[in-house]
């Protein structure tokens, strides 16, 4: 027996100049939701055209598969997606990343499934921990001298990363919710990445060397 709730949205022409839905924009957003909620199945259909479009999205791997999707046209330098997650109280954070052989940096961050294009505390926590861990690991395996230090920008060269945090009282900066301001999330993400990335590099030294090379 099928059950559930159906919600219908109809744009008010008095409020919006354009009341025609853009299928590609909606499709992109639904894909994000499916990636951010592992196992959730979303079906999107556009029945307006003579040849209707329909797609079902479900990603058991969650943000791991999101990173794979973002790197689909790139050449990763390591096959394994680095994944870390943790909780503290009512807050949860997960991070997935992979390096490719290009130079550009791509970090997509989300808070309660809301895209934060200007970053915020969750991105700050990740960047700080990534730089600290890679420098410490580089010195440990003698790829860096004691006085050498890799800059944060260099640590993120060729990086594709997705950060997703869930929290009960998200504090967004600005009306567009473009930036997350919860300082406790910076600490949570920093601690997760610091602990789990260090352990990952110890268990996968070949990946660590590829990243640092």
What feature does the model see in each segment?
Residues 1-213:
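GHKL-family ATPase ATP-binding module
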């Amino acid at each position: 027996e099928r059950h559930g709730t159906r919600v219908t949205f109809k744009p008010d022409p008095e409020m919006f100049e354009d009341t025609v839905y853009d299928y590609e924009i909606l499709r992109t957003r639904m894909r994000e939701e499916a990636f951010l909620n592992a196992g959730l199945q979303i079906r999107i259909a556009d029945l307006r055209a003579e040849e209707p479009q329909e797609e079902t999205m479900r990603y058991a791997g969650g943000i791991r598969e999101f990173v794979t999707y973002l790197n689909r046209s790139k050449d990763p330098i390591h096959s394994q997606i680095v994944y870390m997650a943790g909780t503290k109280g009512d807050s949860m954070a997960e991070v997935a990343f992979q390096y490719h052989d290009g130079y550009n940096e791509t970090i997509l961050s989300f808070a309660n499934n809301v895209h934060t294009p200007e970053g915020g505390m969750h991105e700050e926590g990740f960047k700080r921990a990534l730089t600290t861990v890679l420098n410490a690991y580089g010195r440990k395996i003698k790829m860096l001298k004691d006085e050498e230090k890799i800059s944060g920008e260099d640590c993120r060269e060729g990086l594709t990363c997705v950060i997703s945090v869930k929290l009960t009282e998200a504090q967004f900066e600005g009306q567009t919710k473009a930036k997350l301001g919860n300082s406790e999330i910076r600490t949570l993400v920093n601690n997760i990445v610091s602990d789990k990335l260090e352990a990952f590099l110890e268990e996968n030294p070949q990946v660590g060397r590829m990243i640092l090379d």
